[in-house]
Amino acid sequence: SNSSFQTVQQYLQQAAAQYRQQPVYFYLQLGRELKQLPPQVPEQASLLDSIIWSLKFRFYAWRQHQSVDGAPHVTLYLNYYDPAHQKALKHSTALEKGRIGSVNLFAAERQTQQNHVVLAHELLHAFGARDKYDLATGLPIYPLGYANPQQQPRYPQQKAELMGGHIPLSSSTSKRPDSLQYTVINDLTAAEIGWLR
């Protein structure tokens, strides 16, 4: 429901207020249910595979759009999966060019808060934010992907940088934040999405 997105809206508006004099407003609206799934992001994709997928995804988005959808600045396709049948989700992705994304989420009330983290992460990709974690290991990259890189001792961190994706517990372990309350948006991410000049 639209009310489930209010947490994400408020989080982003409060984060933006730390960087901008003028308020930034986010309005998230749940669209209609679609019958055709977006093209799957290829596993271990070559550059050519990624380009082909990107073109297919843009074509999919163009074909799915109807006049009742209005003219959103960003369109995220939310793919919900039953955690009883799917233990792990494939990687979500969003494209800055075209401002579209395919977001994989769990369809369970107990996963709502973690879904908000994934949704906010992918939404910021659509506005130009870059990942700040090692794609091979999933670990946040120091210092860019750390919420508090100056902390002494460095570990364990208490929060995740949103685009770092995980809370670093040691140099080789991390955990997913349980909710947006355990994330921050650092200066580099704020600059990438235009909140800092």
PLM features: residue spans?
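Stable alpha-helical elements in mature extracytoplasmic
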Residues: S4, V8, N115-L119, L123, ...
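A broadly tuned preference for mixed-charge, low-complexity surface segments
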Residues: Y25-E43, H121-P140, S172-Y182
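Metalloprotease/metallohydrolase-associated module, dominated by Zn2+-dependent proteases
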Residues: S92-E96, G101, F106-R110, G138-R197
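Propeptide-to-catalytic entry region of secreted or membrane-anchored zinc metalloproteases
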Residues: S1-D69
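Structured segments of extracytoplasmic/periplasmic soluble domains
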Residues: T7-Q18, L123-A126, R130, L169
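Active-site-proximal segment of zinc-dependent metalloprotease catalytic domains
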Residues: A61-A136
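Residues that form or immediately flank small-molecule/cofactor binding pockets and catalytic motifs
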Residues: G31-E33, Y81, A108, I167-P168
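Intrinsically disordered, low-complexity boundary segments flanking structured domains
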Residues: L12-A17, Y60-Q66, Q86-S92, L144-P153
